[in-house]
């Protein structure tokens, strides 16, 4: 992704987030996915053209899915602005997204997400030790290539103001750029990663606070 492409895409996502629902409303499924080739769509305007004839439910589904997919690309772009972070050079290789410090032991699949409902009443404890939440993610979210688990870096978005603010939080690019830069500076192979099912993971918490400030928290580094 070039700087120009990032600028266009980040602007598109900030526009799109205003009209997409917080929740899916439908489970990801092949019958809906086959209606359009979402992975060939590069811009918000093109997406709207492709889904124009679909039902409102399908429109919401594709808007949300495309938003999350493209948001992940923007996250990876921001990480790769740091000299010690490189993107997987093989776009077809799904075993990892990013590598830190030219170290194959620091390869991670990057996963944007939120704090699950069952953990929201104990956020302070989760931030202090997210092990249980990480285990929940691995047990309940999609697994990696050929049903094998991958090292994962979870980007956990949470708004203390309103849960509906968690989607716009994903588009706070200036905030994220600073957070990812700090993380890239701190990560080492000696970090206290969470181990589960023979893989390792870490969490970057991205918070919007009640006073409108934004803060972050790292677990392993």
Predicted regions and their residues:
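Active-site beta-strand-loop-beta-strand hairpin of nuclease catalytic cores
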Residues: 90, 99-111
């Amino acid at each position: 992704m070039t700087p120009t492409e990032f600028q266009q895409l980040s602007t598109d996502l900030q526009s799109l987030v205003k009209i997409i629902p917080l929740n899916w409303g439908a489970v990801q499924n092949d019958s809906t996915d086959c209606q359009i080739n979402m992975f060939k769509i590069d811009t918000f305007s093109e997406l709207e053209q492709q889904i124009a004839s679909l039902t409102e439910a399908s429109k919401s589904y594709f808007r949300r899915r495309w938003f999350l997919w493209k948001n992940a690309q923007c996250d990876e772009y921001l990480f790769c602005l740091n000299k010690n972070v490189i993107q997987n050079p093989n776009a077809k290789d799904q075993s990892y997204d990013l590598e830190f410090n030219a170290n194959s032991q620091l390869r991670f699949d990057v996963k944007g997400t939120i704090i699950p409902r069952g953990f929201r009443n104990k956020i302070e404890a989760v931030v202090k030790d997210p092990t249980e939440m990480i285990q929940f993610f691995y047990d309940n979210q999609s697994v990696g290539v050929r049903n094998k688990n991958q090292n994962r870096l979870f980007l956990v978005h949470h708004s203390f103001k309103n849960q509906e603010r968690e989607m716009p939080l994903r588009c706070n690019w200036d905030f994220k750029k600073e957070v990812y830069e700090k993380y890239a500076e701190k990560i080492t192979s000696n970090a206290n990663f969470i181990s589960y099912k023979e893989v390792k993971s870490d969490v970057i918490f991205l918070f919007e606070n009640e006073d409108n400030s934004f803060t972050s928290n790292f677990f392993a580094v």
